[in-house]
Amino acid sequence: MHDFETLARMIINDDPQLDALHLPADGIFQKVPTTLEELTCNVAADLADLLGRHAGQVPTLTFLWGPCRVGSTALLNVFAESGFKAIYQPIKNLLRGRLNQQSKSDHSEIMSVFSLSPPWTVVKETSGPYTVAECLFNPLDALLRSGFPPSKVQLVVLSREPADMLASWTRKWSSRVSTGDLHAHFLLARLNERRIRRAAEQASIPVFNFTSTPGVEAVSAVGNLFEAIGLADRFEPTRLEGWGGSDPLCGSFSSVVFPREPKAFELSNLHDPLPGYGMGNLSLDRSSDFRTHEQIFVSHGLGELFGLAVETLSAGRDARNAG
């Protein structure tokens, strides 16, 4: 049983002991005990091996990150439809392989798809939902430890109305993770933004912020992002619509490269079919103030964790807005 409040305080205080903390196995998603440091070292080694197999010109890497259900796959598909190689959480795929004790031979599929194509490749990574390890793992740190040059990376931190994200977490995963743990994991995954941003700051990686935007404002929001990251000439509004397909594992995102997940993590219909970016039912909860959901967390003994997370995330947002 994790002390979630202690984990949150360690994140908030940038406690280096967090990486050495014992993470017990659950027998389903995580087969063996481990630490974040051990996972990071192992995944970085796997990445170095994969990148070495595709040695050559290093592309600019646009690195999308957010908590699960932030709208990252839909945004990734915009890049894919715009002609970029766009890979669905390749680093998390390696992490899950390590958690699930896959052998090296089981990495064959990710090896076949993990080629970063010059001059520009886009990947998306997320935090959560099944294990504390997934919530607190830092994929950007693993990438940098693999030897990928930070000068070729740009980070895009994604956000979405938290009440909508929580509703989506509950809708997709409440049958696979206990309600209390799922709510705690949700808050830890959001707090992990501090660790991601810190890794970028320490490596002098530029950071861009993007809010998943439904409806009529979606086109201008994505257009502004393309301009900010230096891709204004590649933006075409028509790429945000006309999506087809309803694959059980890939949804409507047929242009994205999807490495196959370890069996324990596969979930049919995780990706709802969308006709285009911002056109789905992105808003599942009409309450715009996430604090109105406090009682849900209190009922699961997570009141202190909720307060810590809301205060920390609000302070971070206010500081960025002031800057």
Region roles according to the model:
Residues I12, R197, H271-L274, E294, ...:
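Residue-level detector of alpha-helical secondary structure
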Residues G71-S82, F208-F235, S252-L267:
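PAPS/PAP-binding and catalytic site of the sulfotransferase fold
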Residues L94-G97, P214-V219, W243:
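A short acidic, often aromatic-flanked loop/helix-cap motif at beta-alpha or helix-coil junctions
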